[in-house]
């Protein structure tokens, strides 16, 4: 996990300033949130539906509803969602969750997603998603979108897409498919 943490943190860290607060929605064990807080000197809070036995000791918000983030409006500078949206079975509900993230963010939402570029990528996406998540009981509905589809969906639904970038992660998937970062800035 350490190699994956470092790769994810390298993508997210430039978008979080020292002293800012961030909420990691879908934080899992909190390993990435802890590492990101350490690197950026920011204050992390974890948020997830599932209680993990090995969850890192961070401030924690327990979700009881997958479509609602249990926090007040604009209560964190930044909201982070790492590989969360493709675990939501209905595409419409993915937008609800993204809107919830923006509701609690003062500045921006950082979304990292698996984004297959072609059919071969999609096959590897599905295989790795199943291998990495099935044993934890995490939903795996395979609701992936391409980078262009996500950018269009975000833009057409009122989000301001300030930055996007794609890369092939080395860990844990050995660069078999793409991840994309979307920086969604608060309007106004």
Q: Where on the chain are the PLM-derived regions?
A:
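Conserved alpha-helix/loop element of class I SAM-dependent methyltransferases that forms part
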Residues: 2-18
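Conserved class I S-adenosyl-L-methionine
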Residues: 20-28
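A short, conserved alpha-helix within the catalytic core of class I
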Residues: 88-100
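Class I SAM-dependent methyltransferase SAM/SAH-binding core
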Residues: 29-68
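Core SAM-dependent methyltransferase catalytic element
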Residues: 170-188
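A conserved beta-strand element that flanks and buttresses the S-adenosyl-L-methionine
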Residues: 80
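Short catalytic micro-motifs in class I SAM-dependent methyltransferases
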Residues: 83-87
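C-terminal alpha-helical "lid/dimerization" subdomain adjacent to the S-adenosyl-L-methionine
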Residues: 112-171
């Amino acid at each position: 996990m350490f190699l994956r943490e470092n790769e994810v943190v390298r993508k997210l860290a430039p978008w979080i300033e020292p002293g800012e607060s961030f909420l990691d929605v879908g934080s899992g064990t909190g390993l990435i949130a802890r590492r990101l807080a350490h690197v950026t000197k920011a204050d992390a809070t974890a948020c997830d539906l599932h209680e993990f036995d090995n969850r890192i000791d961070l401030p924690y918000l327990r979700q009881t509803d997958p479509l609602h983030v249990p926090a007040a409006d604009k209560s964190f500078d930044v909201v982070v969602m790492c590989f969360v949206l493709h675990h939501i079975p209905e595409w419409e509900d993915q937008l609800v969750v993204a809107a919830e993230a923006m509701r609690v963010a003062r500045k921006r939402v950082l979304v990292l997603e698996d984004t297959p570029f072609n059919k071969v990528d999609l096959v590897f996406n599905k295989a790795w998603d199943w291998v990495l998540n099935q044993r934890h009981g995490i939903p795996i509905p395979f609701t992936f979108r391409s980078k262009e589809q996500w950018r269009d969906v975000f833009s057409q639904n009122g989000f301001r897409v300030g930055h996007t970038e794609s890369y092939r992660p080395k860990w844990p998937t050995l660069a078999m498919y793409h991840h994309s970062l979307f920086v969604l800035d608060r309007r106004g």
